[in-house]
Amino acid sequence: MKIKIICFGKIKDKNITALINEYLSKINHFTNLTIVELSEEKINNENSIGEIEEALKKESKKLIPYLENSFNVLLDIKGVQMDSIKFANSINQNLIISKDINFYIGSSHGISESIKNKFNLKLSFSELTFNHQIFRLILLEQIYRAFSILNNTKYHK
């Protein structure tokens, strides 16, 4: 099984990058995880709803190639919430049926409504809004925690 995190933009903070690399190293003891960074569409007028919608449509087209032959999880504030054990079990279920898992983090404006029905699961970690760079780190920590639970290591208490 392979896991991909598909997201928009690059990490700019060296400290966050170091922590991300630390979690990638830990996770890759359990499974193959890669991060795919797509370019975020530029928006000249942040107040233009039409321009934002057009950018989201373009970004959605970049996601389509990743949606086939995988269990696709959209990280969405309106998604279902689950605890770490249920999250680990969800990952394990896909391990059993040998499906790759793709996690999607939208751009700063989210994900186009037109593509949201293509995902197998919409998952929310909180009703809070997170910085995209920090959220990537939070997702990696939860994936590592899930594999720690599945492998009975001391990390999860």
UniProtKB/Swiss-Prot annotation:
GO terms for molecular function: rRNA (pseudouridine-N3-)-methyltransferase activity. CDD domains: RlmH-like (cd18081). S-adenosyl-L-methionine binds at L75, G106, F125, S126, E127, L128, T129, F130. It is found in: Cytoplasm. SUPFAM superfamilies: alpha/beta knot (SSF75217). The keyword Cytoplasm applies. The keyword rRNA processing applies. It holds the Pfam family SPOUT_MTase. It is an enzyme of class 2 (transferase). Keywords: Cytoplasm, Methyltransferase, rRNA processing, S-adenosyl-L-methionine, Transferase. It catalyses: pseudouridine(1915) in 23S rRNA + S-adenosyl-L-methionine = N(3)-methylpseudouridine(1915) in 23S rRNA + S-adenosyl-L-homocysteine + H(+). GO terms for cellular component: cytoplasm. Its EC number is 2.1.1.177. Specifically methylates the pseudouridine at position 1915 (m3Psi1915) in 23S rRNA. HAMAP family: 23SrRNA_methyltr_H. This is Ribosomal RNA large subunit methyltransferase H. The lineage of its organism: Bacteria, Bacillati, Mycoplasmatota, Mycoplasmoidales, Mycoplasmoidaceae.
